[in-house]
Design a protein with these regions (language model features):
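Active-site-proximal helix-loop-helix substrate-binding element of RNase H-like nuclease domains
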Residues: 79-82, 90, 94, 162-201
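Acidic, Mg2+-coordinating catalytic module of metal-dependent nucleases/exonucleases
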Residues: 129-135, 140-141, 178-220
Length: 220
C-alpha cells in the first residue's frame, strides 16, 4: 500500500476563516466551504461484481479542479474468503501478465486496505468526489468494500462518470461519447497500463481537462 501527499501546502489549498469581531467583544468564525477534491479512481478485479469476486487492486489520484495532483493512494488486496475469479475475467488476465503480477504483490487484507483508504480520504483538504471511467464499475467495488469493511463512505452514494460528462460536453449520444470521439486536447501524454495507479492518474488528468474547458478555467 502507498499513500503519497504532494508538497502542496495544506494552507494554500484551504481558505483560512478568521474570527470576525462584533460589538461587545465577541467574535464569530466565518464558515467557508471546503473545495471539491476530484478523486479519480481505478480498480482491478477478478470478476464483474464484489462478493462472489474480489477487488484485487485499488488506486486513487486526488486532483484539485486546476489539475494539481494533491495526493495518491494505492493498495493491492487479498481476495475475499470464499470468492473466486470469474472465468471470463481470468481469461482476460492471462493476456495481462505484467499487470497481474503487479496487483498480486504486497497484499493487504481488505479490512486493513479499506481502513487505510478511508483515513487517506479523510485527510484530503476538501470534499472528495468519486470520479471514474466508467464510474458504475469502479464505484460498485469501492462502495461495497468501504461499507463492508469500514461501515461508511466519504463519497456518500454518488459518483461522477467521465463518459457521461463527455456526452454532455460533446453533445453526443452516450454510446458515441467514447475516447476515440473525444478531442485530443483533452488527453495528456500519460500511460494507460491497467496498473491501477497509472490509470487513475491518467483519467484524472482527462477529467480535469474536460472540467477546465467546460467552466473556462486554466489548468496547471
Amino acid at each position: 500500500m502507498s499513500a503519497k501527499i504532494s508538497l502542496v501546502s495544506f494552507f494554500s489549498l484551504v481558505p483560512f476563516a478568521p474570527a470576525c469581531p462584533l460589538q461587545g467583544g465577541r467574535a464569530f468564525a466565518v464558515k467557508i466551504a471546503m473545495p471539491e477534491i476530484y478523486v479519480s479512481t481505478d480498480v482491478e478485479a477478478d470478476g464483474p461484481i464484489p462478493g462472489p469476486h474480489s477487488m484485487l487492486s485499488l488506486a486513487s489520484a486526488a486532483y484539485l479542479p486546476n489539475k494539481t495532483l494533491v495526493s495518491t493512494f494505492a493498495a493491492n488486496l487479498e481476495t475475499l474468503p470464499g470468492a473466486s475469479g470469474h472465468p471470463e475475467t481470468m481469461a482476460w488476465w492471462q493476456t495481462q501478465a505484467e499487470a497481474w503480477d503487479a496487483c498480486r504483490k504486497e497484499l493487504l487484507s481488505p479490512h486493513v486496505a479499506m481502513k487505510n483508504y478511508l483515513a487517506w480520504l479523510k485527510r484530503l483538504p476538501g470534499r472528495p468526489v468519486f470520479v471514474a471511467y466508467p464510474a458504475a464499475y469502479d464505484f460498485m467495488f469501492v462502495y461495497w468494500y468501504l461499507i463492508r469493511f469500514t461501515g461508511e463512505s466519504p463519497f456518500s452514494h454518488s459518483a461522477l462518470d467521465i463518459k457521461t460528462y463527455a456526452m454532455a460536453l460533446l453533445r453526443k449520444e452516450y454510446r458515441e461519447a467514447t475516447k476515440d470521439n473525444m478531442p485530443k486536447r483533452w488527453f495528456d501524454q500519460l500511460p494507460h497500463t491497467h496498473l491501477a495507479l497509472d490509470d487513475a492518474i491518467e483519467q484524472g488528468a482527462l477529467f480535469c481537462n474536460m472540467l477546465a474547458e467546460n467552466v473556462g478555467m486554466k489548468c496547471e
